[in-house]
From Swiss-Prot:
Organismal lineage: Bacteria, Pseudomonadati, Myxococcota, Myxococcia, Myxococcales
Post-translational modification: Palmitoylation helps stabilize the inactive state; may self palmitoylate. Palmitoylation plays a significant role in pore formation.
Organism: Vitiosangium sp. (strain GDMCC 1.1324)
Designated name of the protein: Gasdermin bGSDM
GO-annotated biological processes: defense response to virus
Region C-terminal region: start-end pairs: 238-266
């Protein structure tokens, strides 16, 4: 959805991550997404598709350090796009009303996420769980997204952060002077606001919530009459986990080739 040349987005996509346009809580491994007619919708947890689970769901490993993603920056975004992302992020912390007035001199905005953590589940474990489980064949989600015209995906990893830095520029690249104490008043006590030592136009926001800004997912489909997990190259299914639980390639599915992904239903 635009911004496809942005190096940060391209970098995350190259690692197999879908980049969430409006970072938020609530996106977790083992949650399902349905894609139909260009829209991606949140559908709920994988367990709701299972009538008789063979065992406990695959274990989720939480709060792993994501050093390879930490500190990645977007390129300069237009003010209208950048300020909407900032307002959405701040709203997740219960703050941000009126923040656009503090950036009224800005024409470009750039984001950087720090303290990035990952929650993940092993795709092979998910595939094995699906193979052994009894799936609800009458579930409308299965009929619509697996047997119908849609596509069904299960999230296997999310990347999240509670700290992000916003750099603002005037038209032509000049810096602006941001009033950090005033910004702190606007966001209240739910976020800590700090100015960069090197630039008054760069501000870091830090809160307690971990907001998800990217995720990996694999497609759920049917092979030889059985529900199974597929690994997808961007835009096409590459291969499936075989009945013996063989090796699965690492390529996860990219749901939007254009850039940032909008999720419906959260």
């Amino acid at each position: 959805m635009g911004l496809c040349s942005d190096p940060a987005i391209t970098y995350l996509k190259r690692l197999g991550y879908n980049v969430v346009r409006l970072p938020r809580e609530g996106i977790q491994p083992l949650h399902l997404l349905g894609q139909q007619r260009g829209t991606v919708e949140y559908l709920g947890s994988l367990e709701k598709l299972i009538t008789q689970p063979p065992s406990e769901p695959p274990a989720i490993t939480r709060d792993q350090a994501a050093a390879g993603i930490n500190g990645q920056k977007t390129e300069n975004l237009s003010f209208s796009i950048g300020i909407n992302i900032l307002k959405s992020v701040l709203a997740q912390f219960g703050a941000g009303a009126g923040i656009e007035a503090q950036y009224n001199q800005a024409r470009k905005v750039r984001f950087e996420f720090s303290n990035v953590l990952a929650d993940s589940v092993e795709p092979l474990a998910v595939g094995q769980f699906l193979k052994m489980a009894e799936v609800d064949a009458d579930n409308p989600v299965l009929k619509q997204y697996v047997l119908g015209n849609g596509r069904l995906y299960v999230i296997t990893q999310v990347i999240k952060s509670n700290e992000f830095t916003v750099a603002a520029e005037k038209s032509g690249g000049g810096s602006i002077q941001l009033d950090v104490p005033e910004i702190q008043k606007v966001v209240g006590g739910k976020l800590k606001v700090e100015a960069s030592v090197s630039s008054q136009s760069t501000v870091t926001y830090k809160g307690e919530k971990q907001l998800v800004f990217g995720f990996k997912c694999f497609e759920i489909g049917v092979k030889n009459g059985e529900i199974t997990l597929f690994a997808s190259q961007p835009g096409a299914i590459a291969m499936a986990l075989d009945a013996a639980g063989g090796v699965m390639p690492s390529d996860s599915a990219l749901l939007d080739e254009g850039g940032l992904l909008d999720l419906e239903g959260f």
